[in-house]
């Protein structure tokens, strides 16, 4: 069965079942990163969810920026959206900001405030909004999100030009921070060759099943003059 889904922004499970898909198909598509369950009984294609989430969250960031006091830097999932990194809806259910201070954060209905040290080099401007740098954003996500989500964001950041050296320097500054062990594990697992969110998620799933790390974008050569698409090679 082809996995090209002829669907609008949102499609109910019953509609997909009527088109010939079964529950196993939907689970495989969800695990592979092609489908996202936006709520019980409703799905959307992953890239469409990304677009919907980004547009909605950018509006929230703008509205929040007009009301925040000075010193609040957009961070975590909010910074990921501003940098163009893939995010899951739950990662941006609230607008995330970090203030340069130690101590516990504050979670409100719309805004979650994190308290953590912030160096000047860890703050950039995107569309005139103060946002944590790409390095700091990836590390904050790696400390706080499930590994599949953190790896998907980190792989994209490497593709955008972020280096492992930058991530390593950032990790040194986070010694003893909550979640830093998980962040180190995520950083070690990142692969610039990953070409999609689904590919990043699949690598994590393979690792969690105890399978060897795949060789990405492996060129399969045949005796025939036919070009085969690049893919995984499991050792």
Protein language model regions, located:
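A short, surface-exposed helix-loop junction/capping segment
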Residues: 179-190
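Short gly/ser-rich loop at a beta-strand->alpha-helix junction or flexible surface loop bordering the NTP-binding
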Residues: 1-179, 203-205, 212-215
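A mid-sequence, solvent-exposed acidic-amphipathic segment
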Residues: 188, 192, 196-224
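Active-site metal-binding core of divalent-cation-utilizing nuclease and nuclease-like domains
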Residues: 104-106, 212-235
């Amino acid at each position: 069965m082809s996995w090209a889904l002829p669907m609008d922004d949102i499609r109910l499970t019953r509609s997909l079942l009527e088109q010939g898909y079964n529950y196993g198909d939907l689970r495989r598509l969800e695990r592979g990163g092609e489908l996202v369950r936006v709520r019980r009984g409703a799905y959307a294609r992953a890239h469409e969810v990304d677009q919907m989430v980004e547009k909605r969250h950018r509006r929230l960031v703008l509205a929040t920026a007009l009301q925040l006091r000075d010193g609040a830097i957009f961070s975590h999932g909010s910074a990921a959206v501003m940098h163009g990194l893939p995010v899951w809806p739950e990662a941006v259910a609230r607008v995330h900001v970090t203030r340069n201070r130690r101590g516990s954060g504050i979670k409100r209905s719309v805004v979650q405030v994190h308290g953590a040290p912030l160096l000047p080099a860890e703050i950039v401007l995107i569309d005139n909004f103060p946002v944590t740098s790409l390095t700091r954003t990836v590390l904050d996500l790696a400390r706080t999100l499930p590994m599949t989500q953190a790896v998907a964001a980190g792989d994209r950041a490497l593709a955008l030009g972020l280096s492992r050296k930058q991530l390593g320097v950032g990790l040194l500054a986070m010694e003893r921070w909550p979640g830093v062990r998980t962040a180190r594990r995520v950083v070690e697992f990142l692969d610039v060759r990953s070409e999609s969110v689904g590919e990043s998620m699949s690598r994590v799933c393979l690792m969690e099943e105890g399978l060897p790390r795949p060789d990405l974008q492996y060129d399969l050569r045949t005796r025939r003059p036919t070009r085969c698409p690049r893919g995984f090679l499991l050792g």
